[in-house]
UniProtKB/Swiss-Prot annotation:
UniProt name for this protein: Girdin
Signal peptide: none
Gene that this polypeptide is encoded by: CCDC88A
UniProt modified residues of type Phosphoserine: 233, 237, 449, 1020, 1387, 1417, 1675, 1690, 1717, 1820, 1837
Species whose genome carries this gene: Homo sapiens
Keyword tags: Cell membrane, Cell projection, Cilium biogenesis/degradation, Coiled coil, Cytoplasm, Cytoplasmic vesicle, Cytoskeleton, Epilepsy, Guanine-nucleotide releasing factor, Intellectual disability, Membrane, Neurodegeneration, Neurogenesis, Phosphoprotein
Phylogenetic classification of the source organism: Eukaryota, Metazoa, Chordata, Craniata, Vertebrata
């Protein structure tokens, strides 16, 4: 029975399209297997697993049981693996959810041969098909599908759509990733989701019910064994167990009975169903046969239809050909126009021929002209004869002229000789004049050099001032122009806008014209090509004509030459005779006639040749035309060839696109099936319409906004420019008031930050622009692709038709071009491929037609449901029409937008240029503000003016600018006037000095005469009575002589100093020249840098302006986006409202659902009741049925009996026969009954077996449920772990990113540090090189110092010899002095001295006034530091002390020192590069002022030296003494040396004598000086070594300032420097000696001094004892201070002092201090007080004091001065000491003779090595001092024995050792 039912199902299933598709993967059964074998192979799952492997080869290989042998469990296992793999593939790779119920593996495994089984297998195959179609190898599988029959293909396509597009079966998860989905797309998705949810809930409920039932059954089964076990247990009572078991058995019996009843009913129903099915089957078979016949008919119809289709295609091709032929006809018609053009061209050529004929006529005319010329030749011959006569006359005149020229040449030679003689004489005279001038210039040289220098300085200063004035005027003019331009810009912008509008209209017109002109251009180009060819041909013809004409010209020239020859021969013959002439003429005439004939024949030949050439020309033209035609054809062919190639490429592209189209077609088919999606798309269209309308409106609004923005921007740019100017002014003023110098750094940082921010904005803007451009491009690409696809779909057929026509053309062209044949063959192949593809497309179209028909049926059904939607579709169609119109409008708007954008670009460029101008204005304004600050604008007023309006501010600024400019000009004019006044004063002063020198020389000569006279008097015998008088007179005369000598010495010193100054100025000139050259080079480099920086600045400014403009555009875009966002927010709010309403509906539905559940429960209860009633009714029905059957049987029996009785009545025989028949029937019925009984037994057995299998299945389900629960728990755990791991992974990812960021930061820092390290290393190397050079210089200076000391010793010996000679002379002169003493008047030199001092006071007073004015102007300018001053003081010379005048060795050392130090100064020049230009200007000012300061200092020195002689007369003249003290103090104050010793000249020389001469004892020195030492107890040896005079620190300016302040302090405290007022005084300072860096070490100096003289040792011991004593008494609680602390304190002091003072202020302060000190000295005449000061951290002398670690030394305060008082008796000198004084004076005279040597008065090394860079240089000095290993000498008090040399030497050695050990320890610490 089952086989009979299943076989037709199986046959249907195996012929189904899904199975046929699966068979494409391979044979199902080996060999010729039956359908059953193939079905079994399918159901077993092995084959299907293999198919899945082919689809997804990446699958994990799971064990598949290949030998199933009809085992249900193995089958289920295989199929479950398959189902799992399919589910995994859909979810993971395809991102799809299987919504349809998965194929039931149980049914397939246990009941494969049933309808349910086949349906489940169908599901499996469907899912497999979905996998195959969407996998990576889908192309192969689709090709296999295409290889199938048409019907199967169509069915498979339908199945594919079921799987892929029907969301009820498979749900796509990719929409989850899409963020921007419209509402219309979301709505159908939500509906589907709701349906799916409902279905899932229903399934869940069903499954839960089944689970409950199964669990109850399981509990029932478990209950029996449990009961039996409880029965066995002895605990329970037996009575209870029996009752329970009985109840349980009764329940089970009832259940069993109910089941039996159900089974019986089912059996009966099934039998009835079977009968019904048989009947239906028969009907179905009939219908099948009918359908098969119909199918056959349809197939025959389809074949005929295909035939008709082929014919249709042929007709279509013919139609296409007709179209193409028509197009060709149109082309030929177009060519007709070309023919007309060619006709016109022929006419033109004819005209050209006419022109050529005209040229021919012209040539003939020319020939006639030549004939006329030949006639004229005779006339010309006559004229020639006349000209020859004239020539003869001219030659005569020429000869006369030659003679005259020769005469003139002779005269010229004589004059030249005379000139040479006069030149020689003049040269000789010039040479003599030069010699004379040289002699005169030797005396006037210094004056000229000074005058020149001052003139140059003034002229350079004037030039610079003029340049500055010009630049300022230019800036003012520029500002005014910019203001005017800014005012005019507004009107310009309005005009520009109008012009822009007008231009935009013009542009539109021009664009149309351009299109027309392009077309005309193309025509012109074609014409030009033709014309070019014709031109080339014509040029060839013209060349040939030229050649012919040249030949003719040559022939004519030859004829002319021949004629000329004949003319010449005629002339010759004219000399002979007339008869011969006539004959010759006749002959020549004949020759001429012949030549004319020849020429005429030649001309005729030429004409003939011309005609031939013309013919040839015409022939060639015809050929040219043909060639042109051929070329045109070639061009056409080439174009066609190119077109064909393009078409081929297009076809290839289309082939590629066809595949994409197929996919799109499949998608379109799916869309066709679903009308909802079409409606959604219509909704989208409406949405797009609305969006486009909005966009159009937005574009219009944006255009309007842009125009408004442009206008507002223009206004804003004006306002912004003004506001920016004001803001920048305000900010600069505030920051300058707050910070000053720090503003520059801050502004630099700000600019850098702004640049960075601008760069960031740049990058962001670029990125945004790129994104916008990309999005626009993508949109355009998508639109173009859509249009292309539509166009390609339309043009595919046209292309095919064109290809066919082109193929025919190619066949025609094959003969001419072999290359084209290959291309045609390729095209034919392509054509075949295309035809195949066409066929395939047709088939697909047929499939589509079938699908469309199905869709139409569905659409018909849907249309009934959705009539309202159809109305909406109509509305949407109208909107589509609107859309098209809007698109057109949009295109127009886009065009307008492009024009607007162009205008915007131009406006942006204008904006950029305007912004650049404003920025330039800002820069100029900033410069002006800086200059205003320098000039001294009152900033408080400006701050008050901030509150006023913009106009008033602007006016105020203009007025202030003008006033400040005027002020600056006035100040500059005053400065120039002051400089000129100084010049005049200096020149007058020089003249006065020279006059004084002359008078001194005269006095000196007079004195010499007097001495000679005295000698004469001494030779006569002296009178004994007048001895005392003579002695007194001699004393007076000696005094006067000494005064005169001192005066002479001073004059000579002045002379020497002037010479030294001259040399120093020369060296300074050279240095300045070199510096100037270097500075010029630096300026050029800086100018280049500034130019490059300006260019960069301009580029940056342009970029900045562009960015600002772009930023404004982006802002406008952002505003539009914000508007859109607002609209979206409104939409969102509406959606939220809708959502709320939906939620409410949902809640209502929930409540309904709850009520329904309750109703359902009630119904279930009713159902149970009805079930029980139904069972009872069934039982009743059964009994009634059995009774009915019995009654029927009885009824039949009765009928039979009745019939029998009737028949018995009729025919007894018939009854007998009937009985026999009945007996046979009874037998058959018995047999049937037996068979029925047997069948009943079988059914019982089957029932038992089924019950058994059912119980087994229940057990298996229980096991599976437990497994399922376990798996569920495992799954939950794994999910939890997965979430945890994902969280950890995200954390780790974040950490990794942070680490990445930190690593990049660290890398950047490392790179920066490495760069810094490299820079520091380079700087260190540079510093090391500088240190090395300085060390080398130091060594050279030490060597020079040693040499100078040796020279000093030699000179000392010479001076001693001279002293002895002078003593002898003095003894001789004493006698003469006695005689002439009465007539000697000593007052004039004093008066001269006073006159000089008065002049000095006037000069200083005038300078004070000038300096005060300068202070006012300079204090307002902010000084960076005094480094520039320090640098400019390089050539500044130290004034020499009075104590070191005669020592030549010192000056020798100094000259060498100046050379080296000048080199150092030049090396240190590069640090000037980094300074601004204003500082350079300031430097120039300082340099000029310094040169004048040097002059003043030299004058001051002269005054000091005059003071030494005139103070011998202490009680006589007080005023002169005061003045000289002032000048002496000034000499000390101008020096940069802090420790400068103030010994008298005589005292110093006496010391030198004592030190160097061994014969003199300690008694030779004045005892008064010793007593002074003992009384004060504070005398120190203060003589300098050779190089100590040059000991100066790096910060000379600060020292000068400090010294000035301290001089003031000293004056207030009634303390002054001790001067050498008397010959017997030794005023020694308390300070130590200062050891300079260029000089020898103090230890070497001490050693030398101690070795040379024991007296000096004695003095040292005494001074040290006195000092030690004083320190102990004075400061018992003093501290030891480190050098670094001391330096830091000093730097703090000096930095404060430097800011308030300039170089010119020094003189004012010096003069004030001098005036105070002079007053004080005038009051305290008898007692001379010495002030010894030590400035903190200024000199190495101070370091000498402070480095010692002994506690006895004082810690000097940073602002206090160390003052020690030296009191000396001012009494008259004793007779014992007078001799010594005389000796000293004589020695000074002898030494003075050697002051004229060149080394004597050179500037010191320290004067040149006055370094620059105040604050920065201090630190470098500090570093140098800390690195210096040399320690100062800590001098201990020596033992009592003063004469011992050994103790001093040992002390010095110990100090040397201690210093070495300390230096080593320091080096170790530093390392």
């Amino acid at each position: 029975m089952e086989n009979e039912i299943f076989t037709p199902l199986l046959e249907q299933f195996m012929t189904s399209p899904l199975v046929t598709w699966v068979k494409t993967f391979g044979p199902l059964a080996a060999g010729n297997g039956t359908n059953l074998d193939e079905y079994v192979a399918l159901v077993d799952g092995v084959f299907l697993n293999q198919v899945m492997l082919q689809i997804n080869p990446k699958l994990e290989s799971q064990r598949v049981n290949k030998k199933v042998n009809n085992d249900a469990s193995l089958r289920m296992h295989n199929l479950s693996i398959l189902v799992r793999q399919i589910k995994f593939y859909y979810q993971e790779t395809l991102q799809q959810l299987i919504m349809m119920s998965l194929p039931n593996v149980l049914i397939i495994g246990k009941n494969p041969f049933s309808e349910q089984g086949t349906e489940e297998v169908k599901k499996l195959l469907l899912l497999l098909l979905g996998c195959a179609v969407q996998c990576q190898k889908k192309e192969e599988f689709i090709e296999r599908i295409q290889g199938l029959d048409f019907d199967t293909k169509a069915a498979v396509a339908a199945h594919i759509q079921e799987v892929t597009h029907n969301q009820e079966n498979v749900f796509d998860l990719q929409w989850m990733e899409v963020t921007d989905m419209s509402q219309e797309d979301i709505e159908p998705l939500l509906k589907n989701m709701a349906l799916h949810l409902k279905r899932l809930i229903d399934e869940r409920d069903e499954h839960s019910e089944t689970i409950i039932e199964l669990s109850e059954e399981r509990d029932g089964l478990h209950f029996l064994p449990h009961a039996s076990s409880s029965a066995q247990s002895p605990c329970g009572s037996p009575g209870m167990k029996r009752t329970e078991s009985r109840q349980h058995l009764s329940v089970e019996l009832a259940d069993a009975k109910a089941k039996i009843r159900r089974l019986r009913q089912e059996l009966e129903e099934k039998t009835e169903q079977l009968l019904d099915c048989k009947q239906e089957l028969e009907q179905m078979e009939i219908e099948l046969k009918r359908l098969q016949q119909e199918n056959m008919n349809l197939l025959s119809d389809a074949r005929s239809a295909r035939m008709y289709r082929d014919e249709l295609d042929a007709l279509r091709e013919k139609a296409v050909r007709v179209d193409k032929l028509e197009s060709e006809v149109s082309r030929y018609k177009e060519r007709l126009h070309d023919i007309e053009f060619y006709k016109a061209r022929v006419e033109e050529l004819k005209e050209d021929n006419q022109v050529l004929l005209e040229t021919k006529t012209m040539l003939e005319d020319q020939l006639e002209g030549t004939r006329a010329r030949s006639d004229k030749l005779h006339e010309l011959e006559k004229e020639n004869l006349q000209l020859k006569a004239k020539l003869h006359d001219m030659e005569m005149e020429r000869d006369m002229d030659r003679k005259k020229i020769e005469e003139l040449m002779e005269e010229n030679m004589t004059l030249e000789m005379a000139q040479k003689q006069s030149m020689d004489e003049s040269l000789h005279l010039g040479w003599e004049l030069e010699q004379i001038s040289r002699t005169s210039e030797l005396s006037e040289a210094p004056q000229k050099s000074l005058g020149h220098e001052v003139n140059e300085l003034t002229s350079s200063r004037l030039l610079k001032l003029e340049m500055e004035n010009q630049s300022l005027t230019k800036t003012v003019e520029e500002l005014r122009t910019t203001v005017d331009s800014v005012e005019g810009n507004a009107s310009k912008i309005l005009k520009m806008e109008k012009e822009n509008q007008r231009l935009s209209k013009k542009v539109e017109i021009l664009e149309n014209e351009i299109v027309q002109e392009k077309q005309s251009l193309q025509n012109c180009q074609n014409l030009s090509k033709d014309l070019m060819k014709e031109k080339a041909q014509l040029e060839k013809t013209i060349e040939t004509l030229r050649e012919n004409s040249e030949r003719q010209i040559k022939i004519l020239e030859q004829e002319n030459e021949h004629l000329n020859q004949t003319v010449s021969s005629l002339r010759q013959r004219s000399q002979i005779s007339a008869e011969a002439r006539v004959k010759d003429i006749e002959k020549e005439n004949k020759i001429l006639h012949e030549s004319i004939k020849e020429t005429s024949s030649k001309l005729s030949k030429i004409e003939f040749e011309k005609r031939q050439i013309k013919k040839e020309l015409e022939h060639y033209k015809e050929k040219g035309e043909r060639a042109e035609e051929l070329e045109n054809e070639l061009h056409h062919l080439e174009k066609e060839n190119e077109l064909l190639q393009k078409k081929i490429t297009n076809l290839k592209i289309t082939c590629e696109k066809i595949e994409a189209l197929e996919q799109e077609n499949s998608e379109l088919e799916r869309e066709n099936r679903k009308l909802k999606k079409t409606l959604d798309s219509f909704k989208n269209l409406t949405f797009q319409l609305e969006s486009l309308e909005k966009e159009n409106s937005q574009l219009d609004e944006e255009n309007l906004e842009l125009r408004r923005n442009v206008e507002s921007l223009k206004c804003a740019s004006m306002k912004m420019a003004q506001l920016q100017l004001e803001n920048k002014e305000l900010e600069s003023e505030k920051e300058q008031l707050k910070k000053g110098l720090e503003l520059l750094k801050a502004s630099f940082k700000k600019t850098e930050r702004l640049e960075v921010s601008y760069q960031g904005l740049d990058i962001e803007n670029q990125r945004l622009q790129k994104t916008l451009e990309n999005s626009n491009k993508k949109i355009q690409q998508l639109e173009s692709e859509l249009q292309d696809l539509e166009m390609e779909n339309q043009t595919l057929q046209k292309n095919l038709e064109e290809l066919k026509i082109s193929s025919k053309r190619l066949e025609q062209l094959e003969k001419e071009n072999k290359s084209l044949e290959q291309e045609t063959s390729q095209l034919e192949k392509d054509k075949k491929q295309l035809e195949k593809e066409n066929k395939r497309l047709r088939q697909q179209a047929e499939i589509k037609d079938t699908t469309l028909e199905e869709n139409n049926v569905k659409i018909g059904n849907l249309e009934k449901e959705n009539k309202t939607l159809s109305k909406e579709i109509g509305i949407y169609k109208e909107s589509c029409v609107r859309l098209k119109e809007l698109e057109k409008e949009n295109k127009e708007l886009v065009k307008r937008a492009t024009i607007d954008i162009k205008t915007l670009v131009t406006l942006r460029e204008d904006l950029v240029s305007e912004k650049l101008k404003t920025q330039q204005m800002n820069n100029d304004l900033e410069k002006l503000t800086h200059e205003l600050e320098k000039i001294g604008l009152n900033k408080e007023r400006l701050l008050h003016d901030e509150q006023s309006t913009d106009d008033s501010r602007y006016k105020l600024l203009e007025s202030k600018l003008e006033s400040t400019l005027k002020k600056s000009l006035e100040i500059k004019e005053e400065k120039i006037a002051a400089l000129e006044a100084r010049l005049e004063e200096s020149t007058n002063y020089n003249q006065q000095l020279r006059q004084e020198l002359k008078t001194v020389k005269k006095n000196y000569e007079a004195l010499k005469q007097r001495q000679d006279e005295e000698r004469m008097v001494q030779s006569s015998p002296p009178i004994s009575g007048e001895d005392n008088k003579w002695e007194r007179e001699s004393q007076e005369t000696t005094r006067e002589l000494l005064k005169v000598k001192d005066r002479l010495i001073e004059v000579e010193r002045n002379n020497a100093t002037l010479q030294a100054e001259k040399q120093a100025l020369k060296t300074q000139l050279k240095q300045l020249e070199t510096q100037n050259n270097n500075l010029q080079a630096q300026i050029l480099a800086l100018q280049r840098q500034t130019v490059s920086l300006q260019e960069q600045n301009t580029t940056l400014q342009t970029q900045n302006a562009k960015l600002q403009v772009e930023n404004s555009t982006l802002n406008s875009q952002s505003t539009s986006l914000m508007n859109q966002n607002a609209q979206l927010l409104i939409q969102q709010s509406s959606l939220e409202n809708e959502n709320e309403s939906v939620i409410k509906e949902r809640e209502d539905l929930k409540s309904l659902y709850d009520s329904l559940i309750k109703d359902h429960e009630k119904l279930e209860l009713l159902h149970e009741r009805q079930a029980s009633e139904y069972e009872s009714l069934i039982s009743k029905h059964g009994t009634l049925k059995s009774a009915h059957k019995n009654l029927e049987v009885e009824h039949r029996d009765l009928e039979d009996r009745y019939n029998q009785l009737l028949k018995q009545k009729g025919q007894l025989e018939d009854l007998e026969k009937m009985l026999k028949v009945e007996q046979e029937k009874m037998l058959l019925e018995n047999k049937n009954h037996e068979t029925v009984a047997a069948e009943y037994k079988k059914l019982c057995g089957e029932n038992d077996r089924l019950n058994h299998t059912y119980s087994q299945l229940l057990k298996e389900t229980e096991v599976l449920q437990t497994d399922h629960k376990n798996l569920k728990s495992l799954l939950n755990n794994s999910k939890l772990e997965q979430t945890r791991l994902e969280a950890e992974f995200s954390k780790l990812k974040e950490q990794y990113q942070q680490l990445d960021i930190t690593s990049t930061k660290l890398n950047n820092q490392c790179e920066l540090l490495s760069q810094l390290k490299g820079n520091l290393e380079e700087e260190n190397r540079h510093l090391l090189d500088q240190i090395q050079t300085l060390m080398l210089q130091n060594r050279t200076l030490l060597e020079q110092n040693m040499e100078s000391k040796d020279l000093f010793h030699v000179e000392q010996r010479q001076y001693i010899d001279k002293l002895n000679e002078l003593r002898r002379q003095k003894e001789k002169l004493e006698e003469k002095i006695m005689d002439q003493y009465k007539f000697y008047d000593p007052s004039p030199p004093r008066r001269r001295g006073n006159w000089i001092t008065l002049k000095m006071r006037k000069l200083i007073k005038s300078k004070k006034d000038i300096n005060r004015e300068r202070q006012k102007s300079l204090t307002l300018t902010p000084t960076r530091s005094d480094s520039s001053e320090g640098f400019l003081q390089l050539p500044h010379q130290d004034s020499q002390d009075s104590s070191s005048v005669g020592s030549n060795s010192l000056e020798d050392g100094q000259t060498l020192g100046t050379k080296k130090s000048s080199m150092v100064a030049l090396k240190r020049l590069p640090f000037l590069r980094n300074r601004p230009k204003d500082k350079d200007k300031m430097k120039a000012c300082y340099r000029r002022s310094m040169s004048m300061n040097d002059l003043v200092q030299s004058m001051v020195l002269a005054g000091q030296w005059t003071g030494s002689t005139e103070n011998l007369e202490v009680p006589d003249d007080i005023s002169t003494g005061k003045r000289r003290k002032e000048l002496g103090a000034m000499a000390f104050s101008t020096t940069a040396i802090n420790f400068s010793t103030v010994n008298s000249s005589a005292g110093f020389r006496s010391k030198q004598l004592v030190n160097n001469k061994d014969t003199t004892s300690f008694e030779d020195i004045s005892p008064q000086g010793v007593s002074d030492d003992s009384s004060t107890g504070s005398r120190v040896h203060a003589s300098r070594p050779a190089s100590l005079d040059s000991g100066r620190t790096s910060t000379s300016n600060s020292n000068n300032n400090a010294s000035l302040h301290e001089v003031k302090a000293g004056a207030v405290n009634n303390q002054s420097r001790p001067q050498s007022h008397s010959s017997g005084e030794f005023s020694l300072l308390h300070d130590h000696e200062a050891w300079s860096s260029s000089g020898s070490s103090p230890i070497q100096y001490l050693k030398r001094q101690t070795r040379s003289s024991p007296v000096l040792q004695h003095k040292i011991s005494e001074t040290l004892e006195s000092r030690h004593h004083k320190i102990k008494t004075g400061s018992p609680g003093s501290e030891v201070v480190t050098l670094q602390q001391f330096l830091e304190e000093s730097n703090k002091l000096t930095s404060v002092q430097i800011k308030s003072s300039s170089q010119e202020n020094l003189l004012d302060e010096v003069m004030k201090s001098l005036s105070v000190s002079s007053d004080f000295l005038g009051k305290d005449k008898p007692v001379s007080c010495g002030l010894a000061r030590s400035v903190s951290g200024k000199t190495p002398g101070d370091f000498y004091d402070r480095r010692t670690t002994k506690p006895e030394f004082l810690r000097p305060g940073p602002r206090k001065t160390e003052d020690t008082y030296f009191i000396s008796s001012a009494g008259k000198p004793t007779p014992g000491t007078q001799g010594k004084i005389k000796l000293v004076k004589e020695s000074s005279l002898s030494r003075q003779s050697k002051d004229s040597n060149p080394y004597a008065t050179l500037p010191r090394a320290s004067s040149v090595i006055s370094t620059a860079e105040g604050t920065t240089r201090r630190t470098s000095i500090h570093d140098f001092l800390t690195k210096d290993s040399r320690l100062p000498i800590s001098v201990d008090s020596p033992p009592a024995a003063a004469d011992s040399n050994t103790t001093a030497a040992s002390n010095v050695d110990k100090v040397q050792e201690s210093r070495n050990s300390k230096s080593r320890s320091r080096e170790q610490q530093s390392s």
